[in-house]
Amino acid sequence: MLFEMTPETFKKVNSSNRIIKGLQYTPLASSIPLENGLQNVLYPSSKFQNEPLQLNSEESSIMQRYVDMLNPGATFVNDSETFNFYKNALSAMITEPAMPAMRVNASPVLDQKVCNSDSLSELNDFTKSLIQPSMLMCEPKEKPDASSINTNRSSSDNGFLTPSSSPRSPSCSRVFNAVQLCSPKKSKDDITTPKKRLMEDTYSPRESPSKIQRLQDVLLKQLQDTRLLISQVIEAENSEDFSSNSLFIKREDDDGKHISSHAIEKLYMALTKLSRLGACDKLLEEGSIILVKQILEKELKELPVACYSIINLHDSLTQFPNLDFILKTTALVLFIIFLVPSFKKLQNEESILHLLNILHSIFEYTVPEAIDNIVQSKTSDARTSEIQHLSVLLQKVANVLNILSKVAHEIPLSEAVVIRIVYLFPKVSTLDNSFKTKLPNCNSSSFDFLKAPLFQTLQYLFRLYPYQRDFIIEESLTNFSHLPTARSVSRTYRLSNGKSIQYYSTLFVRLIQSCSIQNLFDSEIVQSESKSTEALHSGNLTEHLKTVESILSKSRHEEYRIANHIVAYLLSRSLKQNKTESDNSFAILTKILLEDLLNMLSLPEWCGTETIIRQFAMNLVMTVTNDKQAVSSKNAALDLISLIVNKVLALFDLSLFEKHNIPAPTNFNDIISFIPSITRLNELSQVSFNHFYFLCKGDISLENILPYNYNKWFSFLLQLRKVCNDSEALKIIDNCIDKNMQKSQEGFQGPSPFKADENDEDIFIISLYHSSLFLNLKFFVSLIIGFLDSPQASLRTKCLRIINQMKTIPSILRTHPEVLAQIISKSNDQSAIVRDTVLDLLGTYIMAYRETIPQIYGCIISGISDPSTIVRKRAIKQLCEVYEATEDLNIRVDIASKLLTRSNDEEETISELSLEVLEKLWFSPASNELDCQKGYEQLTFLEKQKLRVQYFPILKLCAEPSTERHVLLVTSLKTMLTSKEEINLSTLHTQIRLLLSCLFNQLIEVVTEDQVDESTKGILYEIMSTLFVFSRAFPFLFDLSYLHLLKPYLRSASTIEEQRFLYYVVAIFRQVLPFQKEISESFLRSLESVLLQRLTKAGTATLMEIVPCLCSLFTRLNDYERLKKIVVSCLKSLEEARHSENNFQKMVRLIDLIGLFSRYGDLNRINDDWKHSLDFISPECDDAYVILLGYFQKLLKDAKGQLRIHIIDNMSRICLRETSLFISPLMLSTLDMIIAENNVNEVSVLFKSFLELLAADEDLIFEADQKLSLKGKQNVQSNKSVDRDMLKGTKDKQWIEGVSASLMQHFLPCILDSCFSKNLRYSMLGIEILKCIIHQGLVNPRMCFSTIIALESNAIKETREVAILLHTELHRRHESLIDGLYAQSADLIFSLQKTEEYQTFKLGEFSPFQSAYTIVSADKSSKSRKKLIMQILKPLKLDGIDLPSFTEEKVSFVSFCCVCLAGIPYVSIEEPLMIISTVDSVLATIGPTITGWMKKLDHERFKILAGINLCNLIYLKRYIKYAFSISDSSRPIREKKPLTLLNRGYVDLITSDAKPDIVSKLVIKLFEEENILSGEDQVEGEQLTVV
């Protein structure tokens, strides 16, 4: 089986009349004859254009026309003339088919009562002789479903039947049925009264005419009426006085007589009635009917061209010959040509050509004028009226085309007539396209009335005239390019499966089906049934079948030739059109056609579709395997192949074999595997053929369906016979062949074999499985997979996308691990689109086979760190699906960890997506499927376990002892909180509360365990770390009961693990306590006591949590005296320790305590005399913070090493509490001293305090922006997040006081210098401060811009990214301020990169201004780019005055600017031309002077340096010209597309240490080669261009 795929089983609608219904959906013109002007067109009773037509009451009344006209007449035939009439009429009725002009639902079947001997005894002798013996032995049959017969029946028999078959139209049955429609004769038992019974006995049977006799009278009367009408017309034509005759009229514009519209209608109706009774050539005189035809043709030839104008459509029919008269006359002439056989022999070419010229004139003048009238209509009512008139006109023209199609089917036509008919097709298509283009909103179904008969005519011509096939195909393809590309406008034809396609697509399939042989065995090959049977038993079947195979082969080759002609024409044009081109209509039309063909593939009525699709596939395969084809053509071809492959895979359904009891082949890629199932397939084929015959008989438009399917099946049998080597299997195949030959000779008769619960489409789909299209399916799939290793990234991407679209791709990858490994290897492809498609494909695979997650998961998770944004997005989405699908907790933890790292991605969309996915996986109610209204205690045991499994990854992430991880978690959780609206916020709060309840219940369970082992400690640590993280993010969701549970864990700690545990507990209390409004004083006192006990032995991190918590307790208990005692006690102890030795650790702890209590405690609220309390340190004022700051300054003078750093750190803490102290003289002098000493560690401490100060300002700005954005909204978000001011120990708005701006402006030089430090941590602190400065606008951006540009070329990636972001922000907000600073930036970069005296420069190296150029180019303004380049060109613009001042450093700087200019990837060619023009002007100015010095061998130092500079400028010019392919002639070409450097090699510039002799020779040589004209001799306006 193909890749062992699991095909999809389709639910199909069962219907026994799919073929006829499928061909009924497009509305056709009514074939009822014209009668009453505009009222003669019968509109379908359905209101919708794409529904099957139904007969209305008027049509039904016309069907009963002959029954209503029955009149009693003579009871027997006694004259020879009448006898000959009946003989001819009834003979024609038995052998000739019914005319299609009258639409009937079904052919009536003989009733058993009519066929008995009593009824037959009423016939006269000649009538009995005309009836076939088979009609006398008829048996009752089931009446077929009326809906299964096409409403557009035609007159031709099925060409697949031999002359010995049953009659093509049951005319005798119609005779008997017409008699039956009269009231039946009553028996004597049915007569109720004796008087009536007596009257019945007295009357003779001859006195009451029988039903047959009455019908014979009707036939005679119809013949007499027709002859009389024809004679009246001829006599009126020859008579001069016609005033009393209504058949001819006189026009106002001339004195001649003209046949009236009334006469034409009567002739049409009379001939129609008579044609249904028999052959008109035997019933009418040939000379009379020829005269009538000549009269009509004369009328048409005398009509002026003005008659074709649409304005005459509303005139009176009796006053002027209008379009209605023209169309009626044309239809009648064509009808006469169709009815009279003599015209068939004569091939009256002149008459038909004249009629065709009339149709051409209508399409050239009338219809375009009608469309223009609609377009020019000023009101909607007028437009509606015009559209209705156009619809009426087109339906009348369609009636003429219907008759023309019958003529084309029955009458041999000359080449000129065929060509003229074919030329009608482009005109109709042009008008249809014009209507849809000018009136896109109007219903264009009226033109479908024209297409239906026209397509049928082309189908007949295509079959009957093989030499004209190429001409018909060329015309069809030429008009294909003019079709509308909008699917909603073009797809107006609805198939039987309900899908809409464009009408044009059906034409190609009709033409292909017309190539098939109609009667394979109706020739000299098989003379009779006995001979074929004799050949089978005599062993001559092989030779006999060779001839049959040769005929079939020629037929199939013709089909393939025509199909290949169509496909080659379409693909040769469509594959050349690029999607980016403005006019890619042909490519779109080709794709629409292929989609339509694929929709028709499974429908039996369009059996020729498979041939065209096969040729499509083969041509596309040749395109993609041709190395000479362009990549764009291969991409387009792969797109089309994917459509074919996906459709074929969708149709592959193994359940059909089981449904119809067929042995399924073992290998669908080998035709031999179908041999075991050939018997059953042959039986179903015979059933299918009977079904086709039943549905298509009598309709010439469907005459190709049965022969095409039969020939295809017989060809398959012959192909099997050739490859079969088993004698037993060969006998089975020969038996099937013999049965098919016999069936063809006997004819396919009988009712439809399908019942309501069966599907006639199944057998046809099964027959497709052994077609070449399905047999090559594996090859198509293998071909697509082969492009995984294509060198073109676009082809690899296309291949992966096609594979991903295949519905059976998971099973293919499952059974072919080598293909899976090939796809996985593309996860490291250079193309981001390829990597993205690989992740999508692997995600589809592991979702289908979840057991493969551990093997494939690693490839997907690597994509989350991909440099491409689209790949990271795809990886995040795929990981979300894997997280939900897997039960492996370790994988879930890993996924959550990777998603968390992406929450601070540099791309904002990635960060938002990561947080969205994490929130969905952790806190979405749908993730745990629990009732959110329930509390944790109300959950069942299984629900609790499920909840713990869901929160397991959160615990594992929080348990990592990493500050960065905790900060990332808290930031992510806060972002989830602040990004929610009020409605969604409550849901998130509910989920968090459920998580906290779960954690604290686990905490209780762990504590109550008897033994505490290492695993229990680990669980306890995970729980506490998780509570710590959530206390920072959601402190307001903690209950007071949780604090009571946590208090026992405030125990002393001796080990590192215990210290960390204590740190978590204290931090939770610090965050949660401010949000507990109702809490007992006893609990607070107890908590205060415990924290004071842990204060002395707490670690540094724990101390920084305990002190803020204690300060919060002091404020809550109003216990400021305790705070004062602690501070005073620490100061006294510190004063004592400073005079002692070996007390470093004690002093550090005391200094930290003083600094922390000063920052988080409000010392100003202590009502006491600080000067008196701290008299031991001799304070100079009464302000506690100033006293402490002065004391620390004294300590700083004598401190060294780490103690000095601690003092500076705590001085900064005091200033952070009272920010105005930062700019106090005391603190500023201290800061200046620290900065002057330039100790990196000490300055880093200051920078950290600056960052904290700026972060507070940043938060205030953020809160102000949030309030501004939420202003005016109804659901204003409540700010229940952490109190940032409390955490920072201040509530003052320092940004109002200007402290931040003053500090940053004062220390800006130091901050900018720190950005270039080799100490990475120190430089990153400076860059972070610079980022805050720019964002808050604390200094003029011009002061920082040069530093930012220099940082863009930094070796550290993080530094470069920050610099690029800052430059982008400044360019967007302050472009006018920074435009003139690029030259200054170049000077700074040069000074930073200068490492040696004689530095070497190479053209083509990375330009420090490449990132700056990219940022400036983003706004697509050439003005900004030119300003940047002109700034860098400034140092190159030299004149004679500058030459004496040349130094080595200046030469190096100019060389550096040359490197900067050469390494930029310019967007426009104008920019390299600007550089060349500047260099030329400099060479023309100073070149002759310098060259003169070199020729004189003047080796003065500044002259040699000037020569070196001149050579470097020439090198730059040559490099630019070569890199961008620029010549010295013609005008410049302005290119809008980005240019690619053709030369990425390096060109060494001359350094300052070059020898004077070499420099002199080189200057002279280069300058003479440049041929620069100096001064006034320079040609003005000389420009360059791209080669």
Swiss-Prot record:
KW Cell cycle (keyword) present: yes
Region (Disordered): 140-172
Family: Belongs to the SCC2/Nipped-B family.
Transmembrane segments: none
Gene Ontology molecular functions: ATPase activator activity; chromatin binding; cohesin loader activity; double-stranded DNA binding; single-stranded DNA binding
Gene3D superfamilies xrefs: Leucine-rich Repeat Variant
GO cellular component: cytosol; heterochromatin island; nuclear chromosome; nucleus; Scc2-Scc4 cohesin loading complex; SMC loading complex
Job description of the protein: Plays a structural role in chromatin. Chromatid cohesion molecule required for equal sister chromatid separation in anaphase. May form a stable link between chromatids in S phase that is split rather than removed in anaphase. Also required for spindle-kinetochore interaction in early mitosis and inhibit sister chromatid separation until the cleavage of Rad21 in anaphase.
Cell location: Nucleus; Chromosome
Ranges annotated as biased composition (Polar residues): 147-162
Sequence ranges of Low complexity compositional bias: 163-172
Name of this protein: Sister chromatid cohesion protein mis4
Assembly mode: Interacts with ssl3.
The species this protein was found in: Schizosaccharomyces pombe (strain 972 / ATCC 24843) (Fission yeast)
Keywords: Cell cycle, Chromosome, Nucleus, Phosphoprotein, Repeat
Phosphoserine modifications at: S183
HEAT repeats, residue ranges: 775-812, 814-851, 853-888, 890-927, 1101-1140, 1183-1220
Taxonomic superkingdom: Eukaryota
